[in-house]
From Swiss-Prot:
Primary localisation category: secreted
Name listed for the protein in its UniProt record: ComX pheromone
Functional summary from the UniProt entry: Part of a major quorum-sensing system that regulates the development of genetic competence. Acts through the activation of the two-component regulatory system ComP/ComA composed of a sensor histidine kinase, ComP, and a response regulator, ComA.
Extra remark beyond the main annotation: The DNA sequences encoding ComQ, ComX and the N-terminal two-thirds of ComP show a striking polymorphism, which determines the specificity of the quorum-sensing system in the different pherotypes of Bacillus. In ComX, the sole conserved residue is the modified tryptophan essential for the activity.
Keyword Transport: no
Record lipid sites (3'-geranyl-2',N2-cyclotryptophan): 51
Localization, UniProt: Secreted
GO cellular component, one term: extracellular region
Propeptide positions: 1-46
The record's account of how the chain is modified after translation: Trp-51 is modified by isoprenylation, probably by geranylation, which is essential for activity. Modified by the tryptophan prenyltransferase ComQ before export to the extracellular environment. The type of isoprenyl derivative differs among the different pherotypes and depends on ComX primary sequence.
Secreted recorded as keyword: yes
Alphabetized InterPro entries for the sequence: Competence_ComX_Bacillus
Keywords: Competence, Lipoprotein, Pheromone, Prenylation, Secreted
Organism of origin: Bacillus mojavensis
Length: 54
């Protein structure tokens, strides 16, 4: 799970596609996906990797 979160932090465009339902994460069940999306939902991530609370 940590590798997936790290990848999404480094590649925010992928996170955006996942959150919009246009991409999926392999080997992640729907409960795990919901946890990931919920965790990132309160954050705004810029392409340079800086996290800014929304």
């Amino acid at each position: 799970m940590q590798e997936i979160v790290g990848y999404l932090v480094k590649n925010p465009e992928v996170l955006d596609e996942v959150m919009k339902g246009r991409a999926s994460l392999l080997n992640i069940d729907k409960d795990q996906l919901k946890s990931i999306v919920d965790a990132f939902g309160g954050l705004q991530i810029y392409t340079n990797g800086n996290w800014v609370p929304s």
